[in-house]
Amino acid sequence: MRRTLWVPVVVSTLGTLVFQGQSAHAATTPAAALATRPATTPPAITPPAAARLTKPKPKSTVKPTTVVALTFDDGDRSHAMAARLLERYGLRGTFYVNSGDLGKKGKLTRAQLAAIAKAGHEIGGHTVNHERLTDLGPDEQAATICSDRRALLGMGYRVRTFAYPYGAVDASARQAARDCGYNAARTIGGIATKPCGGCVVAEPARPERVYEIRTPGSVHDDTSLAEMKRYVIRAEQNGGGLLPLAFHMVCAKGCGSYSVRTKVLDQFLGWLATRERRGTAVRTIADVTGGKVRPVPAESVTP
């Protein structure tokens, strides 16, 4: 009789321990890994909120008054990690890459760029090798802008918007961006970074100069979390509109003037994700400007 009673108790105790162990494991297992488990072994508890937000947030039926566009220039290798940070909060960004630099030291590989696009981020053009367009003649401008877009389209990306390297733009560069099939182009600067009377604090919801969309300069290593928050709050308090932010490298300890610390970016994204209830949403530049994927002109052949 003792053996008969002892066995169920041991089995019950072991079952409890196994269940507790599975629960602890489920609490630390990434959402992607949980998704691959058989349906017969669901996780015992819900993963943390940050792990759950791996898909873009569904667009609200209420039109936001303020739209923040998070843009990342130059195809730096740190952008693979930056994209994952955005995904943690259900946000998506625009990544402007130089097609001729992919795979080079310090730059994204083609596989990394494909993963960024697959996660729902926008891929945009940035010239073949980051040429300063105002140093080129109109034909050279058109050649690098069109060749870059042609290459990215050939990789399978829906390339609809462009960013001028260094923010350097003139009339012929704007025309080249249009002629090469882009629906919009972003520059650097033009939006106030400090409070001032009558200053521009955001683009209109539909930018008036769609081939010269402005930003509050570039985010630098000395741009504080509080300052980035103020950019957004000033836009909210002044009627809203489109606020594009331009980032470059993302580094844990800083890696030059044109960089943002990983911790600061993470904190900013976490804060930004809470602004939806205030009428502020995060969208890609292509989401805002719209338009179909237009063809790029055929490459000219020199006789």
Regions found by a protein language model. Name each.
Residues 1-31, 35-36, 40-41:
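Secretory targeting and sorting signals
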Residues 45, 51-62, 93-94, 103-104, ...:
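C-terminal domain-boundary segment and adjacent tail
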Residues 65-68, 87-217, 241, 246-252, ...:
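Metal-dependent polysaccharide deacetylase catalytic core of the NodB/CE4 family, i.e.
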Residues 70-75:
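DG-centered beta-turn motif at the end of beta-strands
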Residues 76-77, 129:
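Short, glycine/acidic-enriched loop or turn micro-motifs at the edges of active sites
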Residues 79, 109, 141, 145, ...:
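Aromatic/hydrophobic pocket-lining residues that form the small-molecule binding cavity
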Residues 138-143, 222-225, 259-262, 266:
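Non-membrane alpha-helical structural segments and their capping/turn regions in soluble enzymes
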Residues 219-233:
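A Trp-anchored, charged/polar loop motif used as the substrate-binding/catalytic surface
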